[in-house]
């Protein structure tokens, strides 16, 4: 599955990968970690009135206690994903963190799945 592929790629950096919003208030934030969110999965191309591909749209977040790492790791993730067939535009954007000790950055990525 596409989501599993994305998680496996991000895990190669050695940081935990979680679904966005799944850390509980009681759970301590890891020092650095990725989260992902599937924004939508739309039909791509069609043939004979049926979809023959799908476009997966994800947001990837990286949070860390090290602001410099936040800026570099999201670009590293972008480069890895592009090498593996993902479409990634730009260098990302800042995102808020629920913990004052962490800063975050995110990128939006697309993947075309062919049937």
Residue ranges and their predicted role:
Residues 44-51, 113-115:
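Short, basic, helix/turn surface patches
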Residues 52-65, 102-113:
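Oligomerization/assembly interface segments of phage tail-like spikes and tubes
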Residues 45-49, 61-66, 87-91:
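Short, surface-exposed, polar/charged, turn-prone segments marking secondary-structure boundaries
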Residues 1-47, 73, 99:
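Small/polar-rich, solvent-exposed N-terminal microdomains that initiate assembly or binding
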């Amino acid at each position: 599955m596409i989501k599993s592929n994305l998680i496996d790629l991000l895990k190669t950096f050695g940081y935990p990968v979680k679904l966005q919003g799944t850390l509980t208030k009681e759970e301590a934030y890891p020092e650095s970690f990725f989260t992902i969110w599937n924004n939508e999965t739309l039909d791509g191309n069609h043939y004979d009135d049926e979809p023959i591909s799908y476009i997966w749209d994800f947001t990837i977040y990286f949070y860390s206690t090290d602001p410099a790492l936040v800026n570099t790791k999201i670009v590293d993730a972008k480069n890895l994903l592009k090498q593996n067939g993902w479409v990634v535009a730009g260098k990302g954007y800042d995102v808020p963190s629920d913990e004052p000790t962490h800063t975050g950055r995110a990128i939006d990525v697309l993947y075309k799945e062919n049937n």
